[in-house]
Amino acid sequence: MSFLKKSLFLVLFLGFVSFSICEEEKREDEEEENEREENKESEEKRNQEERPPGFTPFRVD
């Protein structure tokens, strides 16, 4: 019986550790994705500021 308890404890502990590692990696991936989106947005804003005021890329006849 003691062997089963120790085995169960070990399995649960290793599962918890692997779950924690996966969650940490997921969080890091989300942070990197957010940084990429922010960089993309800031780059778009910089590109928009280079245009003169009232400029439209569409031709109006």
Curated annotation (Swiss-Prot):
Q: What keywords tag this UniProt record?
A: Amphibian defense peptide, G-protein coupled receptor impairing toxin, Hydroxylation, Secreted, Signal, Toxin, Vasoactive, Vasodilator
- Has the keyword Signal been applied to this entry? yes
What segment(s) does the record annotate as region Disordered? 24-61
- What are the residue ranges of the propeptide? 23-50
Please state what the protein is called.
Answer: [Thr6]-bradykinyl-Val,Asp
Q: Native species of this protein? A: Agalychnis dacnicolor (Giant Mexican leaf frog)
Which portions of the chain have biased composition (kind: Acidic residues)?
26-36
Q: Where is the composition biased (Basic and acidic residues)?
A: 37-52
Q: Which family does it belong to?
A: Belongs to the frog skin active peptide (FSAP) family. Bradykinin-related peptide subfamily.
A Pfam family that this protein carries is FSAP_sig_propep
- A molecular function GO annotation: toxin activity
GO cellular component entries? extracellular region
GO biological processes: defense response; vasodilation
Signal sequence span per UniProt?
Answer: 1-22
Provide the free-text tissue specificity comment from this protein's UniProt record: Expressed by the skin glands.
Its chief place of residence is secreted
The listed locations are:
Secreted
Function noted in UniProt: [Hyp3,Thr6]-bradykinin: Induces relaxation of rat smooth muscle from tail artery (EC(50)=56.7 nM) and contraction of that from ileum (EC(50)=588 nM), urinary bladder (EC(50)=4.6 uM) and uterus (EC(50)=3.9 nM). Binds to both bradykinin receptor B1 (BDKRB1) and B2 (BDKRB2). In arterial smooth muscle, the effect via BDKRB1 is stronger, in uterus, ileum and urinary bladder the effect via BDKRB2.
